[in-house]
Amino acid sequence: MYYGFDIGGTKIALGVFDSGRQLQWEKRVPTPRDSYDAFLDAVCELVAEADQRFGCKGSVGIGIPGMPETEDGTLYAANVPAASGKPLRADLSARLDRDVRLDNDANCFALSEAWDDEFTQYPLVMGLILGTGVGGGLIFNGKPITGKSYITGEFGHMRLPVDALTMMGLDFPLRRCGCGQHGCIENYLSGRGFAWLYQHYYHQPLPAPEIIALYDQGDEQARAHVERYLDLLAVCLGNILTIVDPDLVVIGGGLSNFPAITTQLADRLPRHLLPVARVPRIERARHGDAGGMRGAAFLHLTD
């Protein structure tokens, strides 16, 4: 059996998958925030419960936000303070007496989608998350591409390209990002960025779901906003595609539930690509909340 953990700032979610990659059982517990020992205990107790339930010693994979393993073997995960700065993989491997695999949660999302039966035909799969932030991962022949610093796929921290500023207006504000830089595309293309753009142009503070509801009702202002957002997304994604040239782009995160993102994006891309470039297939993520657990479990299938 394959155990996949999706660990975030508020919850530890475990999914158990069989050899056919089907989910057999899942459980969630709160993430301990202050004690590393309590954090390790929470993970180990879930593993012990799964071992007992299925009568086996399952493999363990973990997806977690941040850099899963720095050069000295420690984890950097600001959203999981109890474990950040600790040798998490080594400690869990020792306590569980088995090989523990660890990767960035966005890579696990992308891996989950790349291993979907419909998508395994594509050699290079790009996962793009449009949620609280903007991120993603790259999967080549079923394996994550991590890079030297584990930052492959940090698309949200690319800066707005010149074409975007020309389109939006040269007086368009370059917002300061949590990373310390200005103009990162995450501040405009995330769910929060989607709402910020609406407020910037129409001086009305509305959350993304309400804007989308207005769009569905035919509201002209909301429709103009969505057109502008999609144009901005196409400019930024065009830069990424020129570098990566994937066969498939799978979009996840809260904004992926908005059909216009996947149905109207492809037609906007060609003018932002080289003439010889082919627009990749663009699809909405298939596995929803289970994607992180699923991808983490499949880390043991990438050998």
Curated annotation (Swiss-Prot):
One of its GO terms (biological process) is N-acetylglucosamine metabolic process. PROSITE patterns: ROK. Catalyzes the phosphorylation of N-acetyl-D-glucosamine (GlcNAc) derived from cell-wall degradation, yielding GlcNAc-6-P. It catalyses: N-acetyl-D-glucosamine + ATP = N-acetyl-D-glucosamine 6-phosphate + ADP + H(+). This is N-acetyl-D-glucosamine kinase. It comes from Escherichia coli O157:H7. Belongs to the ROK (NagC/XylR) family. NagK subfamily. InterPro entries: ATPase_NBD (IPR043129), N-acetyl-D-glucosamine_kinase (IPR023505), ROK (IPR000600), ROK_cs (IPR049874). The keyword Transferase applies. Zn(2+) binds at residues 157, 177, 179, 184. GO terms for molecular function: ATP binding; N-acetylglucosamine kinase activity; zinc ion binding. SUPFAM superfamilies: Actin-like ATPase domain (SSF53067).
